[in-house]
From Swiss-Prot:
One of its GO terms (cellular component) is cytoplasm. This is Antigenic heat-stable 120 kDa protein. Residues 62-73, 348-373, 380-396 have a biased composition (Polar residues). NCBIfam families: Sca4_fam.
């Protein structure tokens, strides 16, 4: 009687109730997911097959027949290593939840029920099969810690089962990848013939790829995913051709119809066990996470949500219902599985045939394979390397010319490996061994009968065979694998993206091998990185390097060795010929995503990687900066003053950047070198260099220390000294740099740095001497100017205002002279009068009072300026305000639509408004003129005109031609291809007139200046 195990067998349930229970149990099944397992190529975790008598839908149900009734050892192994430990942990969590339940009577009732049943049946089949216990099971499965435990049990358990029952371990009919073969008449149809060990056909599986009009599926978080491609597999219901058992696991596809990576793959599995008549019977359906269908019809495709992504399964609603009915009829069971490739396991009564896997070789020289590699999902398809006979050539026949013949004669990839291993055993010369491996790789990649997937699988098999071969010395193994990698690189028929997958898989085999030392692994890794960096398109290079880095992180290496491997990857990227931008991207990924987040790189390794990244970033910054400088220098619409301002801004940005002082110095050196080598007049270049020097000297001491300023200033002079321009021009620019230092109030250390820059430059001694003289002359001239200014200060300017004692004396003398006649007249009349001395004292006292008031007013003004709320600003702040004010004026001008409004704006805001500095108004005019000229439109593409413009007011004045000797400014002819001026002539004229007025403003010091 099986009713106690099977709620669906209870005749009190209606058919609808049975279906409801069945769906609930399927959803219960979804609560546990099997994480991707570590695997070798073709390493697939298979399900348990059993002879139990109930079609329970839960992986934890325990409704498996007693051991005595189970003939399938795989089922027994799954029960003992996976299902029962999971049940034990689940019951433990349920008991914890019951202890916290507020309904103490119900809690005690369920606790006793569990204890009593456990004494009779440790699998607790009745408890798990009772729908009344559903809420307790669901609540327990919501516990995140329990989920982790169940997943860890699955990982360890399925790994154990695979190692025991894989074909590579010698288990008859062990697991192997499906060999799909394209249909001759239709590209969307594929098929594979499944045979038992005796070679008798069990069935033919047909796969159809469906290209459909995109439809939308919603995920649990509400986001939507479009599906445009999926596949259907015609799973057999009845099998009556041959005896044996069969287990099919078909990978669920991503939303775009492609296969996911191994660590994200989920499967739909059908288990066919040998029935009473020897023929396979469908006994189990293993479906991942809650199964849903994209519609209500029988043709609706099944899908699941796994890890936040939508995956389609290769079964429709109609096929699924048909299979479930057969499972119930055959009294099967369903369990959860998660594998990484479509696989088949077929069992029968005959001797196992050779499989197309790298592990099965008859050569005793190959060590047993290690099952620790994580290889990307590569499903071999179509037939293997075809053959007519499996006769193996003798070792003396091994040479590059005969290897292709051997491949053509090979009955399978295994035969090729046997052939290679025989040659490696007989051949002592390591060079010839490597040649043999190389030619084998060429034979695989050149085989026209293999598709890309099969070539990938066979190349990986060859690499693993090389790593595990005992007849190869360690250095020969390195050279052999590197030869395979080089062959991949040189192959012209394999797409780069597919090559990247081969590289990733090969590195996984190498790093996880127990037959290699870390040094040898690193050598192979570096070769793989070299090949990856040599791929032609950016996406393939990124895929290769990222894949290799992921393999390093997931490998079984120690954390220290992982860090060493990542550093090796970074070093290869750093010395490659890639652009700095691409290097930054790849190194940033190694440092942050792969190294730091995965906690693999040590602090010292992180620092080393960061240095690589800083260096590359500095090179890129240098290139970007020099491009900006060149754009400014060669802009014909900006004068020297504007060029200087813009290059000063660039210099300031460099000084404020995150780079080291040495890197900043290198960039500043490039700036001055670029300016010095430009085609501008020497005076213009000197003016720009002066601005650079002033910017460095005045930069904030808090962000740039004095020693660093000196270092950068030396670099600035070195850029001038080493420029490819004549010596007089370099002397003039050196003087300009020194003038800038004095303008910026730079100290003697900064000035001395100019000499250091000259000494360190790569020029001859005579040029160094000349530049030092120019520097000294500029310094002396600057000191003379300072001394003269100081002397003038002592002499006094505006004597009447600043020398009050002179004012008193002169005023007193005037008073005396005026009073004397009055005194004389009064004396004549003998009337009492005020004496002249008394009047002088009174007048003097009044003047002193006025002076005192003036002094107090001045002192109060200074106090206000120096107070925390005062408006005293640094040079940098003033520059920022100027730039901001210019932008505001330009923006305001842009709001004026008519010519009259624009002319009025120019007069009011630029000519008449003396509260604005000359610099702000002139810069505004220059910017407005540039915008007027840049607003030119193409009227007649076929017409070319010329425009004569003033290069710079500071340019050296030369006659433009013999016919026009009186022109007073240097001019150049600017060719303007296919452009015709449409600017507003009135506005341009008004702007240029305003510029002339402002430049000629009276600078007499007696003119009152309104202070803000």
């Amino acid at each position: 009687d099986t009713s106690e195990f099977d709620p669906l067998a209870n005749k009190e349930y209606t058919e609808e109730q049975k279906q409801t229970l069945e769906q609930e149990q399927k959803e219960f099944l979804s609560q546990t997911t099997t994480p991707a397992l570590e695997a070798d190529d073709g390493f697939i975790v298979t399900s348990a097959s059993s002879a139990q008598s109930t079609p329970s839908m839960s992986a934890l149900s325990g409704n498996i027949s007693p051991d005595s009734q189970t003939s399938d050892p795989i089922t027994k192994a799954v029960r003992e290593t996976i299902i029962q430990p999971q049940k034990d942990n689940l019951i433990e969590q349920i008991l914890k939840d019951l202890a916290a339940l507020t309904d103490r009577d119900l809690a005690e009732q369920k606790r006793k029920e569990i204890e009593e049943e456990k004494e009779k049946d440790k699998t607790l089949s009745t408890f798990f099969g009772n729908p009344a216990n559903r809420e307790f099971i669901d609540k327990a499965l919501e516990n995140p810690e329990l989920k982790k435990k169940l997943e860890s049990i699955e990982i360890a358990g399925y790994k154990n089962v695979h190692n025991t029952f894989s074909a590579a371990s010698g288990y008859p009919g062990g697991f192997k990848p499906v060999q799909w073969e394209n249909h001759v008449s239709a590209s969307d149809l594929r098929a594979t013939v499944v045979k038992n060990d005796a070679g008798d056909e069990l069935c033919t599986l047909n796969e159809t790829t469906v290209k459909t009009k995109p439809f939308t599926l919603a995920k649990q978080d509400g986001t939507q995913v479009q599906i445009s491609s999926y596949r259907e597999i015609d799973f057999p219901i009845k099998l009556d051709k041959a005896d044996g058992s069969m287990h099919l696991s078909m990978v669920a596809l991503k939303a775009d119809g492609t296969k996911p990576s191994k660590d994200k793959a989920v499967y739909f599995t059908a288990h066919y066990e040998e029935g009473p008549n020897g023929k396979p019977q469908l006994k189990e359906i293993s479906s991942p996470k809650p199964l849903k269908f994209a519609g209500t019809g029988d043709d609706a495709i099944a899908y699941i949500e796994h890890g936040g992504e939508i995956y389609t399964l290769a079964v429709t609603r109609g096929k699924y219902k048909e299979m479930m009915k057969e499972v119930e009829l055959n009294q099967g069971q369903s369990v959860d599985l998660s594998q990484a490739e479509d696989i088949i396991i077929g069992q029968g009564q005959s001797k196992e045939q050779p499989l197309i896997t790298p592990q099965q070789t008859t050569s005793s020289s190959v060590e047993p394979p290690q099952y620790k590699q994580q290889v990307p999902p590569i499903t071999p398809t179509n037939q293997p390397l075809q053959a007519e006979t499996s006769q193996m050539p003798q070792s003396q026949q091994v040479n590059p010319n005969l290897l292709n013949t051997a491949t053509a004669l090979s009955g399978s990839m295994q035969d090729l490996l046997n052939y290679v291993n025989a040659g490696l055993t007989k051949e002592i010369d390591s060079n010839k061994q490597i040649d043999l491996i190389k030619e084998a790789a060429k034979a695989i990649l050149n085989n026209e009968k293999s598709d890309i997937a099969e070539k990938q699988a066979n190349i990986i098999a060859l690499a693993e065979n090389t790593v595990n071969n005992k007849n190869l010395k360690p250095d020969a193994k390195v050279a052999g694998v590197n030869a395979v990698l080089e062959t991949i690189k040189n192959d012209q028929n394999t797409p780069d993206l597919e090559k990247s997958k081969m590289l990733e898989a090969t590195v996984a085999i190498v790093l996880n091998s127990e037959n290699l030392e870390p040094k040898q692994k690193q050598q192979m890794l570096e070769k793989a990185v070299d090949v990856g960096l040599s791929l032609k398109d950016d996406a393939s290079r990124a895929a290769a390097i990222d894949g290799i880095k992921d393999v390093v992180i997931k490998s079984n290496l120690s954390p220290e060795d992982k860090g060493t491997m990542l550093i090796a990857v970074g070093d290869k990227v750093n010395v490659s010929e890639l652009s700095n931008a691409e290097k930054q991207k790849l190194l940033g990924s190694v440092l942050k995503k792969k190294g730091v987040e995965a906690q693999v790189l040590s602090p010292a390794q992180q620092q080393l990687m960061q240095q690589h990244l800083y260096k590359i970033t500095a090179e890129q910054t240098k290139k970007d900066t020099i491009k900006k400088v060149n754009d400014i220098l060669f802009d014909p619409l900006s004068n020297t003053e504007l060029k200087t301002t813009n290059i000063q801004a660039i210099t300031s940005n460099v000084l404020d950047g995150p780079a080291t002082a040495e890197v900043k110095g290198e960039i500043i050196q490039e700036i001055t070198n670029t300016v010095a080598g430009s085609s501008l007049e020497a005076q213009d270049k000197a003016a720009i260099i002066k601005g650079v020097g002033e910017t460095i000297a005045t930069h904030s001491d808090t962000s740039l220390s004095l020693p660093n300023k000196a270092l950068i200033m030396a670099s600035a002079e070195k850029g001038i000294a080493e420029s490819q321009t004549n010596l007089p021009d370099r002397e003039l620019m050196t003087k300009g740099l020194v003038d800038g230092i004095y303008e910026g109030k730079g100290g003697p250390e900064i000035t001395k740095a100019v000499s250091s820059g000259i000494d360190n430059s790569n020029i001859n001694d005579s040029e160094k001497e000349a530049l030092k003289k120019a520097k000294d002359a500029a310094s002396e001239a600057a000191l003379d100017r300072d001394t003269q200014n100081l002397t003038e200060g002592f002499k006094g300017q505006n004597i009447e205002e600043h020398k009050p004692h002179d004012d008193i004396y002169n005023k007193a003398r005037e008073v005396i002279n005026a009073v004397n006649p009055v005194i004389e007249a009064l004396e004549k009349f003998k009337e009492p009068v005020v004496s002249a001395e008394e009047r002088i004292v009174q007048e003097t006292s009044s003047i002193l009072n006025n002076i005192s008031k003036l002094a107090v007013e001045k002192v109060n003004n200074f106090r206000a300026m120096l107070s925390p709320t005062g408006n005293l600003k640094t040079l940098e702040e003033k520059k920022e305000e100027s730039i901001k004010k210019v932008d505001e004026l330009v923006k305001a001008f842009g709001t004026k639509s008519s010519t009259e409004e624009q002319q009025s704006f120019i007069k009011t805001n630029l000519i008449d408004d003396k509260t604005l500095s000359k610099e702000v108004r002139l810069q505004t005019i220059d910017k407005l003129l540039q915008e007027q000229k840049r607003a030119e439109a193409i009227e007649n593409p076929s017409v070319k005109t010329e425009d004569v413009r003033v290069v710079s007011g500071k340019s050296k004045l030369k006659p433009i031609s013999k016919d026009n000797p009186d022109i007073e400014k240097a001019k150049m002819v600017v060719g303007r291809d296919r452009v015709n001026i449409k600017g507003n002539i009135k506005i341009m004229g008004a702007l240029m007139n305003a510029r002339d007025i402002i430049q000629s403003e009276n600078l007499n010091k007696s003119t009152p200046i309104k202070r803000e």
